[in-house]
Amino acid sequence: MVYSYSEKKRIRKDFGKRPKVLDIPYLLSIQLDSFKKFTDQDPTGERGLEAAFRSVFPIKSFSGNSELQYVSYKLGEPVFDVKECQIRGVTYSAPLRVKLRMVLYDREAAAGTVKDIKEQEVYMGDIPLMTDNGTFVINGTERVIVSQLHRSPGVFFDHDRGKTHSSGKVLYNARIIPYRGSWLDFEFDPKDALFVRIDRRRKLPATIMLRALEYSTQEILDLFFERVEFKIKKDTLVMALVPERLRGETASYDIKDAEGSVLVEAGRRITARHIRQLEKTNTTELEVPVEYIVGKYAAQDYIDPDTGEVLVSANSEISLEDLAKLSLAGIKELSTLYINELDHGAYISDTLRIDSTTNRLEALVEIYRMMRPGEPPTKDAAEALFQNLFFSEERYDLSKVGRMKFNRRLSIPDDEGSGVLSKEDIVAVMKNIIHIRNGFDEVDDIDHLGNRRIRSVGEMAENQFRVGLVRVERAVRERLSLGDLNELMPQDLINAKPISAAVKEFFGSSQLSQFMDQNNPLSEVTHKRRISALGPGGLTRERAGFEVRDVHPTHYGRLCPIETPEGPNIGLINSLASFARTNSYGFLETPYRKVIDGVITDEVEYLSAIEEGRYVIAQANIEIDANGRMAEEQIACRHKGESTFMRAADIQYMDVSPQQIISVAASLIPFLEHDDANRALMGANMQRQAVPTLRSEKPLVGTGIERTLAVDSGVVVVAKRGGFVDYVDASRIVVKVNEDELRPGEAGIDIYNLTKYTRSNQNTCINQRPCCSVGEPVVRGDVLADGPSTDLGDLALGQNMRIAFMPWNGYNFEDSILISERVAQEDRFTTIHIQELSCIARDTKLGSEEITADIPNVGESALSKLDESGIVYIGAEVKGGDILVGKVTPKGETQLTPEEKLLRAIFGEKASDVKDSSLRVPNSVKGTIIDVQVFTRDGVEKDKRAVEIEEMHIAQARKDLGEEFKILEEGVLSRARNLLIGAGFTDAQIAALPRKDVLIQVIDDETKQTELEQLAEQHEELKADFDKKFEIKRRKITQGDDLAPGVLKIVKVYLAVKRTIQPGDKMAGRHGNKGVISKICPIEDMPYDEQGNPVDIVLNPLGVPSRMNIGQVLEVHMGAAAKGIGNKITAMLEEQRELAEVRGYIKQVYELGDEVQQRVDIDSFTDDEVLRLATNLKGGIPIATPAFDGAKEKEIKQMLELAGLPTSGQLKLFDGRTGNEFERQVTVGYMYMLKLNHLVDDKMHARSTGSYSLVTQQPLGGKAQFGGQRFGEMEVWALEAYGAAYTLQEMLTVKSDDVNGRTQMYKNIVDGNHQMQPGMPESFNVLLKEIRSLGINIELDQA
């Protein structure tokens, strides 16, 4: 493998055994691709905005004399960029402008004669845009639209598993689900009649549907039944024989062959042998007794040729009298329906008998009554309703997917077709459900991923947009029909409000539009790759059963079987597997390597769940010989959803990678294969809650996916093009681009601005730090700057801690964690949290609120941190209760006495008519002010601070753009100098020229002169561009803000809080091993090894066996080896050993392992590169052990040997307090520990007095409401058990809801009288009222 300069700084030793066939695809593509399809112009009009417009336009007036046609659309440029939108609290969106054409037809002339055409561009609201990282900024906050897993449109066959009817009979049903429109269900009842339901309303016999589709009784019977033909003889009947139909029946008469010999005697069962004999003798007719036909059903109407009377009607039961009538009328032939109990049921025949309708109109009326009960049906209304239900393109759409699924399920060869249903479609569904009831076909599995599809952002946004357009359509149609159209333009017809409202509602408040989880890069990526079965059109938590939540065989490689929330949403919210993607229909597919005649190729194909069932697929971990053939005879593989063994020759595909089945979060867990699934689930979920630490540290034991994740998450800065680093400071990196990557006519400079100390959605800190230095070569894709939780481009969620597994005085009982004081001293788990506090000045009825430093009844000391505008300084250290922004609110005018009026007149206005409503620091918070933003309404005068901030921003913008210009200008000038040198100028001559004069020199060489002129032009363009950019920036900064109605000014104060680790904080490893810190122990008391090095953390060994997450023990051993190797390299460098020796040792480490694929060629490194690598490996050599393909026990032992550690992984430890050796050796090593976002500071809370609930008068609950501690039923039992009667009494009265008692007690305490008199608790009065409301009067007697 070839490494770039920056990748050589630190290389992960990879223990993966399998070659990499396919890189993990871009992790956010599901979001970005979907939204791109929505906004991009699509000439075919099959998706996105184009499809929405085409489905609604043209809109015709009711009279047909005018119509509004759609021509094209274009999205404008957003006003503010993403960062500006976040600061200002507005939506990052672009205006949508649509070109519409209004066509007026001439009423008098022939139809279709155009009288007038008007074209105009119409504004149709703003469309929120997706940022580069797959998020949306809505009202200043980043949100993610989660993809939804819903039932695919199409037709599904199912049964009720015998739960509906008490007999336990299985009732089959079929359901046609469109993409939009009414659902159509067919179902059997316990008597085997077929019924139909529309939109889950009351059921009707299914034949009503057929009659409404213009089928007669005769046609219905012919569609669903075969016939049995009889010839009527004098005393007997001759039946046309189809031998196959007799199988399994009991002969009720002697069956004779053509010669007249008896084949089957009466009363005997007819077997396959008898049928073969009948076929052999070519028997085509069979004489049967007359009684045989009794009870059969006529296949058609039989009419007396003379009188026209119906003798036997179709589907009626035939009796001997009927037969006599037919004989009399001279009818010689009779057809009956072929029905048998086994596999040709009489379902439709029975249904026709309970169907009360006889013709189409009656059927339509019946359907109308069911859909619109209580409305009087008319012929036209019934006709229109039925037509609109399933046959109108406006109301019903199966969609492309639905049609494909429908046709494939019913074995119709074509995948394309109409979006509405046809008569044939409905008949085919009825035939199929009867086919299933007869036992010829299977029902569908609705949890199969071939029957569930993904709806992503683009599709959902398109649907919402269409909803808005449909609302507009109604209004437009009315306006086209009214008024004088000659005067109107398209702009006057269209009101963009409904469209904006629909889009805004979707992005702002849909269940699937979620506040982005921004704890760390992993939580961002996972949130964007989440697949939810909830949401509009999906399931609900309460109704979802066990089957839907369970792991299905088709999840393999598509949805992760591990990562799902614990709790009520388990199994309903899933995560996309690492390599999965959606196909054009929205079904999930996963990649496989093709296998041809037992040889594994590198050709990769993506298969959906439907296609996968047809093939035999081997796992990724099968043995392969040197020629790429499978080494074993019998191969473990999957076929039709079952795991089985097959011969190598039968294998058609093979997995791409062992990590294929799991999500990115799960594939971050090293030694995942040794962990129990439940704990792996917790591990995957808890990594998302890790808070970025002050100094990120890469995991010593990783899985090799860390870099991919960090880069794809978008938190690191990645080089767009190769070149050399020209300039670096804390907030900017400048790269001089390689000549061969330049676009013609550009300066060849890439400038990367870094994000500094901004607040994330979870109040953690987002900050980027450069990780390259001036002069370094850069290639495209190199990491230039680290973001939160990344270290040299690797994801780094926690810290490597030295761990010992041993009990320690009960401080690690029940998963508690004992940590060393050194961890806190070195700030290993110190995190920065940024809080945003807002102060809003409003216009009230009594006058406007004012932000000022002149606050009534507040001492000087409280105002010491405010400036003259009443806003806190940046850099001020503040604590709970300090004023951040001074604000006064007008009070209601009070009647003044004459004396007060006189005093006022003499001494001027006193501050008695305003009250203090300043923004103060919340009680439990202590921190530093890092930023202040002031937003002022348009037309309101800006205060001094706002002007200062504005000037600062303008100066900063000028400086940034100026530096950018200077860098770009230097790029142009240096190229001009090179030209001049090439044209014969000397360095001295060029140095003597004034800086800008380089561009105006005259050269003899004409081509070079032209090039120089082009550079001069480019320089002018740069200057003009700079002025323009600066002007735009200045205008943005100085313009007033668009604030909510009634708001005059908003001041936002950003407060940085540093949180060190402390008892009560929650920590976890990556294997689901979580715990709470019980004690921070002095370094000298911690257990230490023979060299005197104390451990950092002591964990309880009892946390491992019952949880079955052995991966953590292996991680500790491997971590010990990795760190040990780092220590050895450190020692070598400190002793200044020969570089060859260092190189040899590093090479030995990277070469270790049996069949390791990713070896590193250390020999090709230069001495400098080896030295830099060694320096970066001092802290330990990072290791990758991919999931299901990781390091083996033998390799861990080899690593421990290389590090000079015992291969048992255990050390002698000594007690820090006594110095005595512990009885047994202890497992000591390095584990990657995370600090989770469940901090004790956010949870710790106490209350003295506060707010009470209105009804019960008990204190509220929870920190947010400043509530009390609940003293529940069990706590009452505890006090009862101790007989602590008085304590219990005060708990239930004065400390809870005895209103008079508690106020009296407060007064007593103030007076220094520590007495209490309990009274009646309010909850007792509530109980009395409840009982009285039931009509039982209770009166209390005075005791």
Curated annotation (Swiss-Prot):
It comes from the Bacteria. It catalyses: RNA(n) + a ribonucleoside 5'-triphosphate = RNA(n+1) + diphosphate. One of its GO terms (biological process) is DNA-templated transcription. GO terms for cellular component: DNA-directed RNA polymerase complex. Keywords: DNA-directed RNA polymerase, Nucleotidyltransferase, Plasmid, Transcription, Transferase. Pfam families: RNA_pol_Rpb2_1 (PF04563), RNA_pol_Rpb2_2 (PF04561), RNA_pol_Rpb2_3 (PF04565), RNA_pol_Rpb2_45 (PF10385), RNA_pol_Rpb2_6 (PF00562), RNA_pol_Rpb2_7 (PF04560). Its EC number is 2.7.7.6. Coiled coil: none annotated. GO terms for molecular function: DNA binding; DNA-directed RNA polymerase activity; ribonucleoside binding. The keyword Metal-binding does not apply. PROSITE patterns: RNA_POL_BETA. Belongs to the RNA polymerase beta chain family. DNA-dependent RNA polymerase catalyzes the transcription of DNA into RNA using the four ribonucleoside triphosphates as substrates. PANTHER family: DNA-DIRECTED RNA POLYMERASE I SUBUNIT 2 (PTHR20856). The RNAP catalytic core consists of 2 alpha, 1 beta, 1 beta' and 1 omega subunit. When a sigma factor is associated with the core the holoenzyme is formed, which can initiate transcription. HAMAP family: RNApol_bact_RpoB. This is DNA-directed RNA polymerase subunit beta. The gene is rpoB.
